[in-house]
């Protein structure tokens, strides 16, 4: 009985008004900008491993303290972005396996201390069930029994089939538990700040190697460009979403795409511009009051590109050359297969 009473007191403490207010503060733009400033220190001094470990600790602490599962999302994203620079670092991080155990305990503690009755009926529950069924049964009749029950196949079935359904149920239960804020507003704020941090990482790298940029007059190669480009692409639609209420947020979308160009990612070059076009078209169609303002912004950008087209193509030409080379390689391969 004593242990039960102690456990009850601990749960009551972590669900007290003071802890709840702390959790609410961890979802504010001010707090996320504090995390931005901290993450910037690790980027500037190029101590990525220390940055990953620090934000892993912050994520774990936030999981224990906060009832809302959205609160640990910002530090986790900062962790992921800093971690993109830690290429082939398994031998480094395996030394901190004890921290991994602690983080798993933090995840378990979150669900124990902030237990909620699972919300089984969500907006996407039925589609997720159909997707899970398709993943589980998709190979039946097409692959052999041995292939179907292989380790890799079982992993994908459990992770992408059952796992994604369970993950959706968990997030549907534990995100936005208080219902006193707009989930999309908070999520868009987080993603725009993360996009700004990704842009900062790219800008910081270029400033660090500015002499090389001046000498070569072209973009720089860095290993983490594709991963960083992915985060920037994820952030573009959220910048436009916030632009519905704050017009200046739209400029962040163009800034993120410019950062994608600086990464030299071919996928980012192509799919990023598709994202921008889709977002712009939606704004032209539905935001009639500011339609002329958007046209003016695009006209200025196009005019600037026309004036500096030679310099633009010269600086970013390496990415375009790699893209055309990849396309030619695919076409040649298809021609050989046709023969």
Predicted regions and their residues:
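Structural signal for the C-terminal ends of transmembrane alpha-helices
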Residues: 44-45, 60-69, 107-118, 167-180, ...
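Membrane-interface micro-motifs in multi-pass membrane enzymes
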Residues: 45-51, 90-99, 152-157, 218-232
């Amino acid at each position: 009985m004593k242990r039960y009473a102690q456990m009850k007191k601990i749960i009551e403490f972590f669900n007290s008004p003071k802890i709840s207010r702390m959790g609410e503060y961890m979802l504010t733009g001010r707090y996320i900008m504090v995390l931005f400033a901290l993450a910037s220190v690790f980027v500037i001094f190029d101590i990525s491993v220390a940055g990953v470990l620090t934000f892993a600790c912050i994520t774990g602490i936030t999981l224990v303290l906060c009832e809302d599962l959205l609160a640990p999302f910002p530090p986790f994203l900062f962790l992921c972005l800093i971690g993109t620079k830690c290429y082939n670092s398994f031998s480094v991080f395996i030394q901190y396996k004890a921290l991994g155990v602690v983080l798993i305990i933090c995840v378990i503690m979150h669900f124990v201390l902030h237990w909620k009755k699972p919300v089984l009926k969500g907006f996407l529950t039925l589609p997720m069930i159909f997707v899970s069924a398709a993943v589980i049964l998709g190979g039946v009749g097409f692959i052999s029994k041995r292939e179907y029950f292989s380790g890799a196949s079982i992993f994908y079935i459990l992770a992408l089939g059952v796992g994604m359904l369970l993950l959706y149920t968990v997030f549907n239960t534990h995100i936005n538990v208080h219902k006193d804020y707009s989930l999309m507003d908070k999520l868009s704020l987080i993603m725009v700040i993360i996009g700004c941090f990704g842009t900062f990482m790219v800008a910081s790298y270029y400033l660090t190697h500015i002499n090389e940029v001046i000498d070569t007059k072209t973009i720089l190669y860095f290993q983490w460009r594709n991963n960083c480009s992915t985060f920037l692409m994820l952030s573009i639609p959220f910048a436009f979403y916030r632009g519905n209420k704050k017009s200046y947020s739209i400029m962040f979308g163009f800034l993120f795409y410019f950062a994608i160009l600086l990464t030299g990612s071919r996928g980012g070059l192509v799919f990023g511009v598709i994202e921008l076009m889709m977002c712009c078209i939606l704004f032209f169609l539905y935001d009639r009051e500011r339609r002329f303002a958007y046209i003016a912004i695009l006209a200025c950008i196009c005019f600037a590109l026309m004036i500096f087209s030679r310099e633009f193509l010269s600086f970013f030409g390496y990415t375009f050359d790699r893209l055309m080379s990849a396309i030619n390689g695919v076409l040649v391969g298809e021609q050989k297969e046709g023969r």
